[in-house]
């Protein structure tokens, strides 16, 4: 009871000792709003429900004894299955009408809520059952509206088989038609036969009654004029019904119907003349379904021709209970609501295949209605029993069996007797069938609960309903239910495998994910073909880049490195040995991308459209050779200028482009010279110079011979496929040996013409100017052989030789024009950089308005510093140039990223070792140079420094002057600013002093690299080194108390107090420690020199012996040097 004076449904059900469902059904019939067991209702509504339920219980408890005889009659009435099937539809209609009339009198007010099914049963019995005189009276049609609604539900169950034209008539059963009485039954013997309940009618009234009552459809409509409609249907199945009514033992074998099928089986009993009201009252659509002739027979239920088991009757009772629910609504609604009711024309719509546990509970309540006497068969036996005596089983016994039946589902089939077999005495028909159905359709727990409820509440009802169940129609219902029963059994096994699958999924979730990942990986590997050979550019790649080149996942490389003891990330750079180790593990050989690749000519400057306008152009000559072999001096001699004298350190550190005009054969001829650095750090510059050259002049010092950079220059020239002219320089020096140089060059497959080869070799002296003209003549001769041509009438194309940022002029690029003519104002794109030529100057500083093929100029007007080595091309308008630049933007970003990553290049082997020792040290640098080529050279040189213990990290590298921004970055990161041939912007010096940033400026790359290496060594912890002091020999041992003192003679060096000593005895060390006491003539002294005697004492050693050798040394700190791995 709630605080507001209301009561909840579950509280009311506890008070009444009923299930929540029963109370909800009663509320529904009384139109009381109650959605669930927790809904609250007022006291008045609760009283109404109590009254309704008490009336139903009173009706149920009244006729237990009668139910038993009815059971006996039912078993007697069993008829041939064929007759039952034919008659069932018509019987339903007749039954519905007769049932309606009977139900009204039987339970005009009381059974409406819960026992409408009973009234229907009573009406069935009314034609013949003397026990229920009230029910037989059709006069109480006034009350039938409620009861009628219930019957209507049964008919609504759509029991009317397509063959039944009268089925609709029963629905209009609202009409209280008198045909319900036996007279109507007499009109249609078929109806009596078809409805199992009509069997009782047949017993008392012969064939006619069965016809009237047996219509299950008429039960749907209490007042329906179903009887008239029945005659039409009976005509179809008249013959079978007489047989069913007249025959006490129907042809159908009485199979112990499953709990659900039994209710349907009860409907067949209703087909019997006396029992037809039962099917009607069984708004549970099962009864109606059973009445349908086409209803399939379920396993465990009696089939046509077999006697119906008492269990069927019980099921029928359950259905009436459902009909009580439907009473609250419409009969048709009940039938529709029933899940088991099929809508097929061949089966009654109200028929429910299995009896749900809820239905069983409902049936128990209606059991209170048994006040109506069970219908009797013509022979006088009650319809409910197979034998008059057998059927009279006390309801108590049935109740006892009901709970046990579900526990033994296998017992039901045994209960189903063969046609005409007598039912087991003392066992209610509904009990076994209901249990069997419950077991088939519900889980064991639900089945037990429902069966248990039935046993407690429906003892009397069970007896009555079992008697009312029509055997023949029950058989029909059983058949119809049997079909769904099989699929249900199939569903159950199917559900088990499903559960197993679910378990597998839960158990193997991670495995499934791994499997999918492996499948995806395998698919990718199948699609991707690994290269036959891996070419590594500049001996460095990141993990991700290596993974892309090998067409594998980066995680595979990381895993491989991990197993090698190296921890890496996808952005980590790998050195060449590490790359080779990883690639070989995946079966791909590694070939280092030699700088020769950079020297190859990748783009043909001459196009097909230029062929008609080609003219001879000046050659581009690159002067190459080892450092200090005289390349720039040779060019000075040719140009008659002194460039080498003004260059820092006397060495060239970036490419110089010069154009020289000479007189050849009386005609002026031009030659463009490119001077490349000879230092090993400028390999990339030499490669770029070779890439654009037409002729390579190899300078070799006669007194030095072939050196490493000489060999590199030879490889560049061969990669560029350009002819080589050898200039043997410094022939004027002492020790010069041109012949030795020729011999060494021949070892490199460069054979002099004098020795029968094809390589021109000219001995020259740049200082004295010897043979310079001969060298120029040889260059022009080779040029004529090469037939160098270009089209000056087209837009210019060429290569960026060098680029830098000038603080006054902005970005400046040295351009070599290889085809066409470059003019002031031209719009050009150099890689991803857009530019418009604002001004051009030649090597002498003279301004030019245009420059033709093979011209080398410095151009101003670029948006940013272009990359050295990029090719440029002039476009007719700025729009088209911007389109090209936009397409190259992504590549440019990748290039910049590569440059940044170059500053972080790490040898993973060294890094992992440092990390394990906790000694990983870094030197942060900010590098600014005059030109980009210098930046590349310095970065390349830094890569050559040992990195086992200290890693150089370049935070920023760019051409240009040192700015205040650079100083701020260095202050924030603790970096050192290194400038190469550059200056500091205004404010940068002041900012550096204020923040304490170290700024170093260099003009020679040697010094820069030396200082950086020293700085790296400064980060290393100094190491302790043993420094020998002297040696002494023990001559005597003196014991002083517990200790001993050794009298020694200094044989070499000296001994100092507190120094480290090592005592050797027979070449073995017996003690090593500190010298604690040093005395001479009983005086403590700090040291004793060679040739003197002294006494030595050590606190931790007293086992002195004569002839022991004492070695004295001290530990000193020493600066460590970088050790290469």
Swiss-Prot record:
Keyword vocabulary terms for this entry: Cytoplasm, GTP-binding, Initiation factor, Nucleotide-binding, Protein biosynthesis
GO molecular-function terms, A-Z: GTP binding; GTPase activity; translation initiation factor activity
Record Pfam families: EF-G_D2, GTP_EFTU, IF-2, IF2_N
Source taxon at top rank: Bacteria
tr-type G domain sequence ranges: 616-788
Cited PROSITE patterns: G_TR_2, IF2
Region of interest (G5), ranges: 765-767
Region of interest called G3, as start-end residue ranges on this chain: 675-678
Biased composition range(s): Basic and acidic residues: 235-246, 261-272, 426-440
Chain intervals with Polar residues compositional bias: 192-203
G2: annotated span: 650-654
UniProt region (G1), positions on chain: 625-632
Region span, G4: 729-732
Ranges where the record places region Disordered: 32-453, 481-514
Location(s) in or outside the cell: Cytoplasm
UniProt-annotated binding residues for GTP: 625-632, 675-679, 729-732
Keyword Cytoplasm: yes
Annotated Gene Ontology cellular component terms: cytosol
Compositionally biased tracts (Low complexity): 32-41, 274-283, 412-423
Pro residues composition bias: residue spans: 127-143
Main location: cytoplasm
Compositionally biased residues, Basic residues: 485-494, 501-514
Role summary: One of the essential components for the initiation of protein synthesis. Protects formylmethionyl-tRNA from spontaneous hydrolysis and promotes its binding to the 30S ribosomal subunits. Also involved in the hydrolysis of GTP during the formation of the 70S ribosomal complex.
Entry-linked PANTHER family: TR-TYPE G DOMAIN-CONTAINING PROTEIN, TRANSLATION INITIATION FACTOR IF-2-RELATED
Family, as annotated: Belongs to the TRAFAC class translation factor GTPase superfamily. Classic translation factor GTPase family. IF-2 subfamily.
This protein's name: Translation initiation factor IF-2
Taxonomic placement: Bacteria, Bacillati, Cyanobacteriota, Cyanophyceae, Synechococcales
Gene (name only): infB
